[in-house]
């Protein structure tokens, strides 16, 4: 059991160490926007989903142009279809309360020798002639 655990840890450490040079920790940082997000451009208001059943229109669009079929709220009775969720600009999530920035923890680098010596400390060293022959 200990051998399996040691193998898994060593494999994880070796793969993490080999990819550590390519990893940029800022890639794993994401932001949960808040209702009044200061990163938005000043000409934009807070991004909120449009009322159900209505399509958002870009500013300056008079609405007289034919943009294809319009979505309408479902009529009472019959099949109840839910409209697809509205697209958000820049694929952001809807605004939420608070502005938090979450990131993955940064662990120190550990060499394979350090990991194996950590597991070898707990049991006494065996000499080759003391090992059972099975």
From Swiss-Prot:
The keyword Secreted belongs to this UniProt entry's keyword annotation:
yes
Disordered: annotated segments? 28-134
Cite the record's Pro residues compositional bias ranges: 47-59
What does the entry state regarding organ or tissue expression? Abundantly expressed in lacrimal gland where it is found in the acinar cells but not in the intralobular ducts. Also found in the submandibular gland, the parotid and sublingual glands.
Leader sequence range is 1-16
Q: Name one GO biological process term.
A: visual perception
For this record, the Gene Ontology CC terms, alphabetical, are: extracellular space
Q: Would you say which domain of life the source belongs to?
A: Eukaryota
Ranges annotated as biased composition (Polar residues): 110-119
Do you know which SMART domains this protein is assigned to?
A: Pro-rich (SM01412)
UniProtKB keywords? Secreted, Signal
Give compartment(s). Answer: Secreted
The record's PANTHER family line, in alphabetical order, gives:
PROLINE-RICH PROTEIN, PROLINE-RICH PROTEIN 4
Q: Is Signal found in the keyword set?
A: yes
The protein's name in its UniProt record: Proline-rich protein 4
- Extent of Basic and acidic residues compositional bias: 120-134
**Protein encoded by which gene:** PRR4
Q: Which InterPro entries match?
A: Pro-rich (IPR026086)
């Amino acid at each position: 059991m200990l051998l399996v655990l040691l193998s898994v840890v060593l494999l994880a450490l070796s793969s993490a160490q080999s990819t550590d040079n390519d990893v940029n920790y800022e890639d794993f940082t994401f932001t949960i926007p808040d209702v009044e997000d200061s990163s938005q451009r000043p000409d934009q208001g807070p991004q909120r989903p449009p009322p159900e059943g209505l399509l958002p229109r870009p500013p300056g669009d008079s609405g007289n142009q034919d943009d294809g079929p319009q979505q309408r709220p479902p009529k009472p009775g019959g099949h109840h279809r839910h409209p697809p969720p509205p697209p958000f600009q820049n694929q952001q999530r809807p605004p939420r309360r608070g502005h938090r920035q979450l990131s993955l923890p940064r662990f120190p680098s550990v060499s394979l020798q350090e990991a194996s010596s950590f597991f070898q400390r707990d049991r006494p060293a065996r000499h080759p002639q003391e090992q059972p022959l099975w």
